[in-house]
Amino acid sequence: MENVAAIILAAGKGTRMKSGLVKVLHPIAGRPMIDWPLEAARGAGAAPVVLVVGHQAEAVRERFQGAGDIACALQAEQLGTGHAVACAAPALAGFSGTVLILCGDTPLLRGGTLTDLLAFHRSQGAAVTVLTARMENPHGYGRVLRDEAGRVLRIVEQKDASPQECSVREINSGIYCMEAGFLFDNIGSLGNDNAQNEFYLTDLVAMAAQKGATCLAMAIEDSDEIMGVNDRAQLAQAARILRRRINRDLMLSGVSLVDPEQTYIDQGVVIGPDTLIHPNCSISGPTQIGNGCQIESGVSISSCRIGDRCRIKAGSVLEDSELRADVAVGPMAHLRPGTVLNDHVKIGNFVETKKTVMGEGSKASHLTYLGDAEIGRDVNIGCGTITCNYDGVKKHRTLIGDNVFVGSDVQLVAPVRVGADSLIAAGTTVTRDVPAGSLAISRTPQVNREGWRIRMKKKT
């Protein structure tokens, strides 16, 4: 929608989180909490957006540094929601449209709900519209009081409510839609004569009714959307609801989740159809997974690009890595940042890679460390191979050409280059470059001392 701005209240410390991190920056489904209502506001067409910051203001500002549609307003002392909005007013000087007022700790709010709220507000010519919900247990919420015609008369906070008012089950979400003219003409008139000695934004509702301005409420069907997060238990509850949404959207797009309740996928992860994901997997960051992949139980994937038909076996950990098509990884493999596996590569159990590129068809089937390495096509890395990439001061690279066979228990002391079509014998420590087509072997010749064991037993 056009001519819409938003104010998001994010100045509170979040004492009940018992954390050194300000509440709105706590992560939920892969994003700081504040990102979710911000995304909802943007989804409804709001621009600019003013964030009211207070505790750890610089950390919140830094999060949105460079975002051209966002301004920050400082609420140095937290004196209530009305005071917070008053602090935001200068950032919207000259704005004459409709203002959405949101809470920074409502990560479940959808952009579509705000679009509906705006449409309802404008269609009724309202000055103020409150988003409400009807709850079986409204304890702790402000109650919405209406007249016989259904118009909103006022909102009373629970601490200030009478027993009769506490029996009302329609509650205030803390989310509002207001015309800028009414809002900024009256925000300075709020008082703090209440149980908490704060400037309540809700008092604008009663003020609108007294002045004959239209004040309405739109009840939301899904009360989860307006759930505020105040402590770690509520954070986990909100995260669970977000995961259900994310997982449902993925399943409807053709992804199979064996147990959605035990699958942890961040918002923004892209997964292709016919991919199968087993329980207890965590997929985070800007990860992209292709079509027809299999992700087995206990896998952790962070910020990776995975091509079609890959299989990630149980217990593997993948970080900042790229897998092309038809790659097999694991079980119990660890791909560290900078790993690139080309088509048909196999990484087996207890293999660790870091800043390593493996060419098409190459394999390291078990018990291997490959760090700072570039490996060609159709290379076999034997069991127990180690690239010795660190000399105690600097890291060095290992370069292995195409069609090389590396036997078991080989150490490649970098910097070193192994030419194409060569063979490294089992147990060899490679300290010099190996020419193409060569055999490299550095073992001590085997000596068999016949009868030695029998003689030793007799001595004991």
From Swiss-Prot:
Catalytic activity as recorded in UniProt: alpha-D-glucosamine 1-phosphate + acetyl-CoA = N-acetyl-alpha-D-glucosamine 1-phosphate + CoA + H(+); N-acetyl-alpha-D-glucosamine 1-phosphate + UTP + H(+) = UDP-N-acetyl-alpha-D-glucosamine + diphosphate
Pathway field: Nucleotide-sugar biosynthesis; UDP-N-acetyl-alpha-D-glucosamine biosynthesis; N-acetyl-alpha-D-glucosamine 1-phosphate from alpha-D-glucosamine 6-phosphate (route II): step 2/2; Nucleotide-sugar biosynthesis; UDP-N-acetyl-alpha-D-glucosamine biosynthesis; UDP-N-acetyl-alpha-D-glucosamine from N-acetyl-alpha-D-glucosamine 1-phosphate: step 1/1; Bacterial outer membrane biogenesis; LPS lipid A biosynthesis
Protein's UniProt keywords contain Manganese: no
Entry binding sites for Mg(2+): D105, N230
PROSITE patterns reported in the protein's UniProt record: HEXAPEP_TRANSFERASES (PS00101)
Keywords assigned by UniProt, alphabetized: Acyltransferase, Cell shape, Cell wall biogenesis/degradation, Cytoplasm, Magnesium, Metal-binding, Multifunctional enzyme, Nucleotidyltransferase, Peptidoglycan synthesis, Repeat, Transferase
Cofactor binding note from Swiss-Prot or TrEMBL: Binds 1 Mg(2+) ion per subunit.
UniProt cross-references to InterPro entries, sorted A to Z: Bifunctional_GlmU, GlmU-like, GlmU_C_LbH, Hexapep, Hexapep_transf_CS, NTP_transferase_dom, Nucleotide-diphossugar_trans, Trimer_LpxA-like_sf
The enzyme's E.C. designation: 2.7.7.23, 2.3.1.157
Domain of life where this protein originates: Bacteria
Region (Pyrophosphorylase): 1-232
Main location: cytoplasm
Assembly: Homotrimer.
PANTHER family with a match to the protein in the record: BIFUNCTIONAL PROTEIN GLMU, NUCLEOTIDYL TRANSFERASE
Similarity-based family: In the N-terminal section; belongs to the N-acetylglucosamine-1-phosphate uridyltransferase family. In the C-terminal section; belongs to the transferase hexapeptide repeat family.
Record function comment: Catalyzes the last two sequential reactions in the de novo biosynthetic pathway for UDP-N-acetylglucosamine (UDP-GlcNAc). The C-terminal domain catalyzes the transfer of acetyl group from acetyl coenzyme A to glucosamine-1-phosphate (GlcN-1-P) to produce N-acetylglucosamine-1-phosphate (GlcNAc-1-P), which is converted into UDP-GlcNAc by the transfer of uridine 5-monophosphate (from uridine 5-triphosphate), a reaction catalyzed by the N-terminal domain.
Protein's name according to its UniProt entry: Bifunctional protein GlmU
